[in-house]
């Protein structure tokens, strides 16, 4: 196994300038600004906040209003802050505390959980290799593992320290799975489909996978030159994200980068490519990226809700296709879609393909 330099080790080594592999291309650098100043901006578009309190209300009108708000945000932005989502605040805190404690271990201790991408062992502790669209490195380390369904997990690679990691993360994954069902139902109704339709199309209760990725973005001596994660869209159906209230997430909306605010007790939710394909482009999978900073470590906990890799062919649903709105996406399995994005797919191509 090839030893990989961890970004955390690099950040703690006392360097004042970052290695050239981390410096973004000139055309990107023009749009990278101070994240704390960006977050304070009140003018211009803001990521919507959606209150899910009434998503299952017995009052039909109240329920419909909630579904309509969720639908609008999914058609327009494809990303939102969810509040009153039903996941206990103390459970979210436990998940964050467990992840923070794991990443506070020494790099040597974390290396016991190292993944090995070269051999296909993708679960575990890792750092980005230069196999992304730009061939460059990103300012982050991470921990990745399948979190749900329980029978498909490999607990042997989950952190043993802290002791609450497995219990807190397992409980959180169960709660997110229930939340995903509520969201899928609302988004199905929003498209004029039967409530259980979208969830069935992505594998249903048996096959939908929840993959947990804890992203650790160390302090960066030259944040104006680097990105924590480069611009991409999520391949998932839905992505749910917690963070440690340090700003960094940016969305490419109406031709400009918009910095997401930190909303207490919220969960950020992205619509992923999978739902964009099924809805024939109605629901948006938005291009997004992560900024880094000099002052504070940023940590985010992303859970990707993904269909099985080969069992389902993803294509626009027949109800979403018409003479006026022909299919925008060719049929492909989830595995083929991932491959399609990994190999030579520049963002410009992705965007132009969506607009074709």
UniProtKB/Swiss-Prot annotation:
The lineage of its organism: Eukaryota, Viridiplantae, Streptophyta, Embryophyta, Tracheophyta. Expressed in young seedlings (at protein level). Pathway: Pigment biosynthesis; anthocyanin biosynthesis. Residues 208-307 form the Fe2OG dioxygenase domain. 2-oxoglutarate binds at residues 215-217, 298-300. Fe cation binds at residues 232, 234, 288. One of its GO terms (biological process) is response to wounding. InterPro entries: DIOX_N, IPNS-like_FE2OG_OXY, IPNS-like_sf, Oxoglu/Fe-dep_dioxygenase_dom, Plant_2OG-oxidoreductases. Changing residue 220 to Y: In tt17; no accumulation of anthocyanin. Involved in anthocyanin and protoanthocyanidin biosynthesis by catalyzing the oxidation of leucoanthocyanidins into anthocyanidins. Possesses low flavonol synthase activity in vitro towards dihydrokaempferol and dihydroquercetin producing kaempferol and quercitin, respectively. SUPFAM superfamilies: Clavaminate synthase-like. The keyword Coiled coil does not apply. It comes from Arabidopsis thaliana (Mouse-ear cress). The gene is LDOX. This is Leucoanthocyanidin dioxygenase. Keywords: Dioxygenase, Flavonoid biosynthesis, Iron, Metal-binding, Oxidoreductase, Vitamin C.
């Amino acid at each position: 196994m090839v030893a990989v330099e961890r970004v955390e080790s690099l950040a703690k080594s006392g360097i004042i300038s970052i290695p050239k592999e981390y410096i973004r291309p000139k055309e990107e650098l023009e749009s990278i600004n101070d994240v704390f100043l960006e977050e304070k901006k009140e003018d211009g578009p803001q990521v919507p906040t959606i209150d899910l309190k009434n998503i299952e209300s017995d009052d039909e009108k109240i329920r419909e209003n909630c579904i309509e708000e969720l639908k609008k945000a999914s058609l327009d932005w494809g990303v939102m802050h969810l509040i009153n989502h039903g996941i206990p605040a103390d459970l979210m805190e436990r998940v964050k505390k467990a992840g923070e404690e794991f990443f506070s271990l020494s790099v040597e201790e974390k290396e016991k959980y190292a993944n090995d991408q070269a051999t296909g062992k993708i679960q575990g502790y890792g750092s980005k290799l230069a196999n992304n669209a730009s061939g460059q490195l990103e300012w982050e380390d991470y921990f990745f593992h399948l979190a749900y369904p329980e029978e498909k997990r490999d607990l042997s690679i989950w952190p043993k320290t802290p002791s609450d990691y497995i219990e807190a993360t397992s409980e959180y994954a169960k709660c997110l799975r229930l939340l995903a069902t509520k969201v899928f139902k609302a988004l199905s109704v929003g498209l004029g489909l039967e409530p259980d339709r979208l969830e069935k199309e992505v594998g249903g209760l048996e096959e939908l996978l929840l993959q947990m990725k804890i992203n650790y973005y160390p302090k960066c001596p030259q944040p104006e030159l680097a990105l924590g994660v480069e611009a991409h869209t999520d391949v998932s159906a839905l992505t749910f994200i917690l963070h440690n209230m340090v700003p960094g997430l940016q969305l490419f909306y109406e031709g400009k980068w918009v910095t997401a605010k930190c909303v207490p007790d919220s969960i950020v939710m992205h619509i992923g490519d999978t739902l964009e394909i099924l809805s024939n482009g109605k629901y948006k999978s938005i291009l997004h990226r992560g900024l880094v900073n000099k002052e504070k470590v940023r940590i985010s906990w992303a859970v990707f809700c993904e269909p099985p890799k080969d069992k389902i062919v993803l294509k626009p649903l027949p109800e979403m296709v018409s003479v006026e709105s022909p299919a925008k996406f060719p049929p492909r399995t989830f595995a083929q879609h991932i491959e399609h994005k990994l190999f030579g797919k520049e963002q410009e191509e992705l965007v132009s393909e969506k607009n074709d």
